[in-house]
Amino acid sequence: MPNNIILASKSKVRKDILEKNNIACDVKPSNVDEDMVKESLLNEKASPEIISKNLAELKANKVSSNNHEKIVLGADSVIDLDGELISKPQHRKEALLILKKLNGKEHHLISSVCISKNGSMIWNYTDKAKLKMKNFTEQELEKYLTKISDNALYAYNVYQIEGEGRKL
């Protein structure tokens, strides 16, 4: 029997959160070109909160427009480090560079969620958390990346605070 809820994301973490809360859902990634949207919004001087909200809404609405009568959940998170938006790393070297940038510094994790039905948003929420990463040597950061392997490539903050990264 198909679910009435669709997660517009390929994020394993987001799916796990829903499952841990006994929320059954189907997964249908939106395939929104996040980099293009982000670049356009940055050119318009949009805040990190607006960027996160718009991406969550765009993802949910896109999947919702092709799945009428279903409730679609879209989400997005961005990292703001002193006005610089940190993007997902494309490879391990880039993940290490991001960790070095965040090392010992305060930064903000901005997360948004949007619920859409029939291609239109019916609810959204955005929140901001202040985080501070401890100081680590480059060797410690390398060791951490080895431990979490390719999982570092699936999160904006690289260190995935919901898992092993909470130790950072």
For the regions a protein language model found, what residue spans apply to each?
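GST superfamily/GST-like fold recognition
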Residues: 1-23, 95, 105, 128-168
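Anionic-ligand binding region
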Residues: 97-100, 111-131
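Generic enzyme active-site microenvironment
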Residues: 74
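N-terminal polybasic phosphate/anion-binding patch
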Residues: 1-71, 84-85, 139, 143-147
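Acidic/polar active-site rim loop that often engages polyanionic ligands
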Residues: 37-41, 80, 120-127
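Residue-level signal for short segments within beta-strands and strand-turn junctions
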Residues: 29, 81, 115-117
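Active-site-adjacent loop/tail segments of enzyme domains
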Residues: 77-107, 133
